[in-house]
């Protein structure tokens, strides 16, 4: 009898061991398959649907290929035509960029102002020079605008490196550099290119030194284009078709701009067909260009990933609130705080707070963690939110966690660490699920476009009073061209073109929308 019991017991244990081994084997196989599919998905995602090239060393710029691990896959896919155009541009930049014989020859003509460059061959290499002016948000928007203009006109874009641009962004083009060499012949003159400069296009038109309507104009070796918010009607002629015909012949263009002027490029007839092929979804222009161009350096990427992993990654939902106060003096204002609360609670982005614990009737219904990222020069806005959700329970039972990475008090453009913090915060905002931005803020424009987010825009307060309604949901994620040329050669097109509209936060501005 004992022998029988022993045999039965052994058989039972053997079957259990076999079953366990079978389950372990299946689990390992499933895990390997799952990991394999994850790895495959990651390898596809890291190039963002072909937007990025694989021709870079990954360690030199971690953010380029790691960003897809921190961001939900974009529902907006780049067109094949855009992908092809970017690869063609990269090859052109290699042939014409700094250090090439073509670049050397192109710089040599800058000293010969007495020659008419409409009759001289400069080959395939023509250039755009970007001058760094105003704050980081403005700079990113103008870089995107200039790069698109470079794509449309087959030019090479080179950026002024006398500021901290190389401390913020990796090189975007493989096997070459986008940095304007410090020995560029016009370096000492770049800061003097203002709206009164005799080499700026608007001034030359005003002084009859150049004429876009005749074929008799002498084409200079370079022109300054002044597209700052205070530009005049002569400067705005840049957006006219006949003027573009003349400007295309100039070998070097130096841009002084603080505006996102892409919407008005769509209203230039000769560009419209090409733009439609590049961006069938018109509100994706900045979204695609930003993800292609702007990859934070490893130092900035470290700031971003540490903040994300420490404060945002565990949340079930992430909300970004970008607060920019344009009042003078700026700082904390109660009416701005009231407006933030009115907007976020009315739009169900944040729950209300109960005074008494007993008012919460459904605490088990939702124990979701909602992380709220606040970016502001001032600490008071996030601190009041933090205290509010600490003192009383939320009406939904959600746990609300408030995080503000920095409180700089003053904007310190061209201070390396300040700008790096600003870029990190822009990027963190773009990683949220929903975003609230401030009226006319370029900082917010960049974050929403990079993240593919349609923001709730806080209207600008008047007379120190919270506006009613406090905010509006944007129609598209595109930034606003805050000072668009609404009159002159584009006046009629503004009103009849279905894919441009006046901005929600600036009646003098234009933005791109999908016409449907």
Swiss-Prot record:
InterPro entries: XG_FTase (IPR004938). It comes from the Eukaryota. It is a single-pass type II membrane protein. Keywords: Cell wall biogenesis/degradation, Glycoprotein, Glycosyltransferase, Golgi apparatus, Membrane, Signal-anchor, Transferase, Transmembrane, Transmembrane helix. It comes from Arabidopsis thaliana (Mouse-ear cress). This is Probable fucosyltransferase 8. Its EC number is 2.4.1.-. The lineage of its organism: Eukaryota, Viridiplantae, Streptophyta, Embryophyta, Tracheophyta. It holds the Pfam family XG_FTase. It is found in: Golgi apparatus, Golgi stack membrane. Belongs to the glycosyltransferase 37 family. Expressed in leaves and stems. GO terms for molecular function: galactoside 2-alpha-L-fucosyltransferase activity.
């Amino acid at each position: 009898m004992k022998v029988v019991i022993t045999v039965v017991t052994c058989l039972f244990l053997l079957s259990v061991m076999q079953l366990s081994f079978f389950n372990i084997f299946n689990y390992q196989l499933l895990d390997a398959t799952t990991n394999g599919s994850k790895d495959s998905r990651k390898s596809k995602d890291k190039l963002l649907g072909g937007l990025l090239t694989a021709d870079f060393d990954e360690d030199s710029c971690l953010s380029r290929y790691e960003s897809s691990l921190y961001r939900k896959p974009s529902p907006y896919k780049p067109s094949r035509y855009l992908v092809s155009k970017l690869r063609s541009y990269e090859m052109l930049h290699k042939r014409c960029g700094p250090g090439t014989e073509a670049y050397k020859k192109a710089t040599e003509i800058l000293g010969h102002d007495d020659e008419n460059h409409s009759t001289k061959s400069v080959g395939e290499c023509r250039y755009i020079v970007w001058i760094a002016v105003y704050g980081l948000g403005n700079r990113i928007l103008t870089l995107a605008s200039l790069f698109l203009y470079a794509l449309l006109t087959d030019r090479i874009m080179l950026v002024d490196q006398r500021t901290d641009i190389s401390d913020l962004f990796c090189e975007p083009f493989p096997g070459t550099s986008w940095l304007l060499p410090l020995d560029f012949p016009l370096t000492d003159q770049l800061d003097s290119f203002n709206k009164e400069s005799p080499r700026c296009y608007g001034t030359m038109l005003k002084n009859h030194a150049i004429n876009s309507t005749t074929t008799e104009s002498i084409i200079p070796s370079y022109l300054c284009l002044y597209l700052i918010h205070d530009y005049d009607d002569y400067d705005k002629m840049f957006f006219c078709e006949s003027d573009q015909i003349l400007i295309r012949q100039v070998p070097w263009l130096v841009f002084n701009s603080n505006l996102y002027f892409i919407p008005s490029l769509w209203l230039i007839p000769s560009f419209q067909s090409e733009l439609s092929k590049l961006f069938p979804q018109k509100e994706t222009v900045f979204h695609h260009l930003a993800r292609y161009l702007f990859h934070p350096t490893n130092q900035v990427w470290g700031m971003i990933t540490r903040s994300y992993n420490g404060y945002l990654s565990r949340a079930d939902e992430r909300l970004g609130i970008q607060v920019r106060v344009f009042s003078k003096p700026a700082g904390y204002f109660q009416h701005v705080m009231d407006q933030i609360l009115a907007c976020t609670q009315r739009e169900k982005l944040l729950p209300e707070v109960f005074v008494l614990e007993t008012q919460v009737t459904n605490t088990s219904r939702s124990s979701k963690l909602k992380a709220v990222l606040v970016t502001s020069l001032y600490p008071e806005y996030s601190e009041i939110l933090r205290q509010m959700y600490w003192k009383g329970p939320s009406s939904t039972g959600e746990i609300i966690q408030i995080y503000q990475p920095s409180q700089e008090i003053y904007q310190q453009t061209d201070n390396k660490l300040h700008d790096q913090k600003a870029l990190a915060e822009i990027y963190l905002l773009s990683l949220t699920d929903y975003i609230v931005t401030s009226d006319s803020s370029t900082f917010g424009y960049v974050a929403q476009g990079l993240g593919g987010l349609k923001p709730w825009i806080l209207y600008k307060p008047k007379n120190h009073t919270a506006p009613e309604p406090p905010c509006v949901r944007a129609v598209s994620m595109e930034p606003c061209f805050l000072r668009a040329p609404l009159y002159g050669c584009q006046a009629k097109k503004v009103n009849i073109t279905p894919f441009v509209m006046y901005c929600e936060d600036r009646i003098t501005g234009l933005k791109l929308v999908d016409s449907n």
